[in-house]
């Protein structure tokens, strides 16, 4: 097996793909996604994809490319806001349950119940007792979803501190990304180490090294297509790069593959 390491970077790295190569590759993979949707509609499958990661790790852009040419009737994106007062007094998982996929549906969660393990814990929006109460049953909750027939895929998009800083600064000056600017953006960098400490117990995930957002998008789609069965699959197109999409290994916390 090839050794996987993280290259130290300061700012944006040189692109691995030309703009045209990226567009061509994305188009071919989106054709495969349409095939996948046709198949899971015919077979009454239920698919749930969760994307987690630090602020500005590329979740929005990845989801946009996945759903771009899919039927909106059978595709839903879930990005829940601040919990209501009622949510705050309910069983923690309760607010997510209504959004789970039914037969013939693909649902993508842009962040998920893992908010409790990440941003809520770091920012003090939950108590340590509430965090521990979440971490205990979360695996059982997900096993229950899988036993009910939901095909569950979980991706954690991992970026370097330098890349996050550049992307957050870019949001502030881009008039088309003002909706992404948040009052807690500055806290993402200030609390970098606390987010790392909160991230680690959430494993295992499929890890995506996402400093290059184009490569991350393509390889996430490839991994989704590899993991799910559908008719007419073009196997030549869907092999993801093992340097970008990784099955979680605890050693990655020590050898620098995951951003420290």
Label the predicted regions.
Residues 197-260:
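NTP-dependent small-molecule kinase module
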Residues 119-135, 145-196, 237-240, 244:
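A glycine- and Lys/Arg-enriched "phosphate-lid" helix/loop adjacent to the NTP-binding pocket
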Residues 1-28:
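Charged, amphipathic alpha-helical linker segments immediately N-terminal to NTP-binding catalytic cores
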Residues 49-67:
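Glycine-rich phosphate-binding P-loop
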Residues 31-41:
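Pre-Walker A adenine-sensing motif
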Residues 56, 83-86, 112-115, 158-165, ...:
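Conserved nucleotide-binding/hydrolysis micro-motifs of P-loop NTPases
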Residues 48-52, 150-160, 182-187, 201-216:
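Phosphate-binding beta-loop-alpha motif at adenosine-nucleotide cofactor sites
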Residues 18, 25, 73-135:
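Conserved nucleotide-sensing/catalytic segment adjacent to the nucleotide-binding pocket
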